[in-house]
A protein has these predicted regions:
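Structured alpha/beta or helical-core interaction and ligand-binding surfaces enriched in interleaved
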Residues: 1-137, 141-145
């Protein structure tokens, strides 16, 4: 099981955060990361993961969606992917998760890149936030320092 953490715990870990995309653009330096395909984007995000080992988080809303929205998402998944989705448990409606294993990252990048369910990725060590996905264009936000 993967247990969620609160927004306060995410911030305490040192992550950047914004409630909306326009807020992120106003608060932080930004760039757009583009990829030709899902595999290329995964390679880039895995690099960020390795440079922030132990300090990577993501939001994942599946556990708090209504039953109909959960069913639509499950319809996109095969058996192993469904088990991955079900591993994420939301405590008290919290949707932030520490990504302690690479399979968690890979699963969330895949779901985001395929437009099934979007996640934002938070990197505490290098202070970056990657917002996905707009036709394989991911806005990335960095601390202004």
């Amino acid at each position: 099981m993967v247990h969620s953490i609160s927004k306060e715990e995410l911030l305490k870990a040192g992550c950047l955060h914004a409630g909306k995309l326009d807020e992120a653009f106003a608060l932080y330096r930004s760039a757009i990361i583009s990829a030709n395909n899902e595999s290329d984007m995964l390679v880039f995000i895995r690099r960020l993961y390795s440079e922030n080992k132990g300090a990577v988080f993501a939001d994942f809303y599946y556990p708090v969606l209504d039953a109909q929205s959960q069913e639509r998402f499950r319809a996109c998944l095969d058996g192993p992917q469904l088990k991955m989705a079900e591993a994420f448990q939301a405590s008290d409606g919290q949707v932030y998760y520490p990504l302690k294993e690479e399979w968690m990252l890979d699963f969330l990048v895949m779901a985001t890149a395929r437009n099934w369910l979007f996640s934002t990725f938070y990197f505490a060590d290098k202070k970056a936030m990657l917002w996905g996905n707009y036709d394989l264009k991911f806005p990335i936000f960095c601390d202004n320092e």
